[in-house]
């Protein structure tokens, strides 16, 4: 195997070679069997996962688990068809059986040969000891107990607190018939706090979380248990004094950071190549055309150190990259994996992702955000006579085919005469993603990424992602609410 000296990454494949007896010869045999029926391409995806989860509810440990899993998924492509089989038994016989099963998607004599392996050069975005995390639960438990104590101390109206911690260490090895060879060790941690506040007969909720591709050392500053607990409690207490949200079409200002989830959902999914190849996206066929305000530039960047959505290599063994999707309002391209790149002739953007070895890869976002502009957040707010300032979001729904969305704002305020006034409750933003981008008239210089809590679902698969944006102003958007 050719291992380019230019790559700064350590090699992680020894884990699978030593623990499971995997060899390069076995990889070549499996790929050969996968191509034997005439497939165009085949790949192997080995995964070994160690996961830990802890939960405290009302100061009582309600859940605690640690587990490991391992397996291999084998994929064969034949034209536009995909054959896939997986096994949690990494013995030679079961791997070869899975390869032959995946090969059934094709029919005919072998027409492709396995090329010599060349390791993918990639960055080292989240260095971790190859021995993995210390499995002692005491330090993890103390984190969530600190969060519980801080939330309760914030205000006597906080009547219920739940805190949880999750952690995984994922090791992968990828070998493909086109010679791609990659391995990685991927840490991921997340701390969440949920609270309920009550005053008289009114109950409100608040939540906050943080995490990323690092260990416990990341839970300091804005991600400390105390900071997250205070943020969750602040949100719940704020809602106790909120007024009903106004309804109608108005100017809307989105705050920096987590509001980027609206960009991710209402626009980002529509820029994934599989939807566009099948012409089920509102952005299909629009490359080179104006799809947003000239102030809007949107990128997807899988190379941000330590971020929740970052990857040294994607789940097909390709290096991740920064991909410009919309530049100055003009659509520049889509997020592609190997299949969509091969079928459309586009470049592979290293966006092939999957939930686990039991799932096929598909084009997915990593860290998606709008670039900063030149406006100050203060000037943006001052420019609004009457409108809504939305700084945090809960759930939402999006129709990829037309870009229509409905999002609930978990924290929002009235803007009156250029000033933030009363907090509002039950505000929803209703619109169309591509259309909304055309109404962006001001973009702040305060780009911020989320705290590392995003999880994205698509076709039954969930993967960690990051989102972000600066403060932006939309000249028109429909707001749903019960106030005036």
Predicted regions and their residues:
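N-terminal small-residue-enriched
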Residues: 1-484
């Amino acid at each position: 195997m050719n291992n380019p000296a230019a790559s700064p990454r350590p090699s992680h494949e020894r884990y699978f070679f030593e623990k499971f007896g995997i060899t390069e010869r076995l990889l070549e045999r499996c790929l050969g069997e996968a191509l034997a029926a005439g497939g165009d391409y085949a790949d192997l995806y080995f995964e070994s996962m160690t996961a830990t989860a802890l939960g405290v509810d009302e100061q009582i440990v309600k859940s605690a688990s640690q587990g490991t899993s391992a397996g291999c998924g084998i994929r064969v492509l034949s034209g536009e068809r995909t054959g896939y089989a997986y096994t949690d038994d990494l013995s030679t016989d079961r791997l070869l059986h899975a390869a032959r099963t995946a090969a059934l998607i094709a029919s005919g004599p072998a027409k492709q040969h396995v090329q010599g392996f060349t390791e993918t050069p990639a960055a080292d975005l989240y260095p971790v000891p190859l021995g993995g995390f210390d499995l002692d639960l005491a330090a993890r438990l103390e984190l969530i107990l600190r969060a519980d104590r801080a939330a309760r101390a914030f205000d006597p109206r906080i009547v219920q607190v739940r805190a949880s911690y999750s952690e995984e260490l994922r090791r992968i090895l990828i070998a493909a018939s086109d010679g791609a060879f990659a391995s990685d060790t991927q840490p991921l941690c997340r701390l969440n706090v949920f609270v309920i506040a009550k005053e008289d007969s009114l109950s409100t909720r608040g939540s906050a979380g943080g995490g990323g591709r690092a260990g416990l050392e990341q839970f300091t500053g804005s991600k400390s248990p105390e900071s997250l607990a205070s943020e969750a409690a602040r949100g719940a207490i704020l809602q106790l004094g909120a007024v009903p949200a106004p309804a109608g079409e108005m100017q809307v200002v989105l705050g920096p950071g987590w509001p980027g989830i609206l960009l991710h959902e209402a626009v980002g999914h529509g820029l994934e190549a599989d939807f566009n190849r099948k012409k089920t996206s509102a952005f299909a066929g629009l490359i080179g055309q104006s799809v947003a305000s000239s102030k809007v530039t949107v990128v997807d960047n899988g190379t941000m150190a330590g971020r929740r959505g970052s990857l040294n290599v994607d789940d097909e063994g390709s290096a991740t990259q920064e991909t410009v999707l919309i530049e100055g309002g003009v659509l520049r391209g889509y997020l592609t994996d190997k299949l969509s790149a091969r079928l459309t002739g586009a470049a592979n953007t290293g966006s092939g992702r999957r939930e686990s070895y039991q799932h096929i890869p598909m084009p997915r976002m990593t860290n998606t955000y709008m670039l900063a502009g030149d406006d100050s957040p203060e000037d943006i707010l001052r420019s609004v006579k009457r409108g809504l300032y939305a700084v945090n979001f809960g759930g939402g729904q999006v129709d990829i085919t037309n870009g229509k969305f409905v999002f609930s704002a978990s924290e929002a305020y009235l803007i009156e005469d250029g000033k933030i006034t009363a907090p509002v409750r039950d505000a929803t933003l209703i619109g169309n993603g591509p259309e909304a981008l055309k109404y962006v008239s001001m973009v702040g210089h305060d780009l911020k990424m989320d705290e590392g809590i995003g999880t994205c679902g698509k076709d039954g698969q969930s993967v960690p992602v990051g989102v972000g944006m600066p403060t932006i102003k939309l000249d028109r958007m429909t707001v749903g609410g019960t106030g005036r």
